[in-house]
UniProtKB/Swiss-Prot annotation:
Taxonomic classification: Eukaryota, Fungi, Dikarya, Ascomycota, Saccharomycotina
Compositionally biased tracts (Basic and acidic residues): 17-27, 237-249
Species in which this protein is naturally found: Candida albicans (strain SC5314 / ATCC MYA-2876) (Yeast)
Record's compositionally biased regions (Acidic residues): 1-12, 263-276
Protein's UniProt name: Chromosome segregation in meiosis protein 3
Keyword Amino-acid biosynthesis: no
Disordered, as annotated region: 1-42, 176-195, 236-316
Amino acid sequence: MSYVMDETEEGINIDNTQHDLELDRDSSTQQPAQTHEDDGDLLGLDKPIKLKTRAKIAKVDNQRIFNHNGIPLLVKTHSKLLRTLKKNDKNFYSEPRSSISKSQKFEHEYENLSSVLQFYQLWCHGLFPKATFKDCIHLIRALGARSPQLRLYRRELIAAELHKLKVAKGIIADENQDAPSIPEEENTTDPSNEEWNSMHMSALVPGSSNKNGLFVDSNSNEDFETTNEVNAAASLADKDALSTDDKAEQTNAITSDTHNNDVDSDDPFSDDDDINIDAHTENLHPASGTQHQDRPKETTEENEDLELELMREYGA
């Protein structure tokens, strides 16, 4: 009772506290009933599954930058920007004034820059509506650094504009054949590159139908057959010349040996035999560095037959 009296003195309502206690009891009795109901579907297999579609992440790529809202739109509409700049310059310099101050020049440049920025802001908004102007510029710069297609497109545009300026100033003559054309949206491949790639692949792929697969022009074999025949004839002529030289040296050595043997056959203690042996070795191995070895006829004929078979396999 003393506790209740203290609460009443402090201004606490006893009726509200009793009501709160009753609510707590009711909630405690209702919680076990709910748990018994949920015991049958603990894993949630009977609950309906809500499918959510993932939103596509917008990004700046070659497909977006080369569509009708990308760089082709800039190429078509940049003439309007040039006209506005010329109009601003004409209005600025047409006003009658004695002198132009620096502040007036800065204001005029500010107007031109604001028109340029507005032009590119509208273009970026049409290209990438969800991105800010700063983010769009950053994404386009990153794409230009890693996309070779975009770099090639930009170089061709610059070359076309330089050609127009040179023609306008009279530096070069206006020839439609020499004028660089503005690149199209679709990628056009060079036929020479396709031929080179096909020839390169035919050379690298083993087991191809072409016999001369290691050569560049693997389909035409007539030129290689003629060259192989010429090379074979030249090699045979060289071998015949070498064989005749070897035979002449052998005959010279044999005649010198027989002559020395006939002269000094009676002297068993003569030293001419060693001299003849040295002369024979010198004839076989001259000092010029070219070694002519005594090759038997059988080995040379076998080597020639093998070389002819190899030339027929690779050259036929």
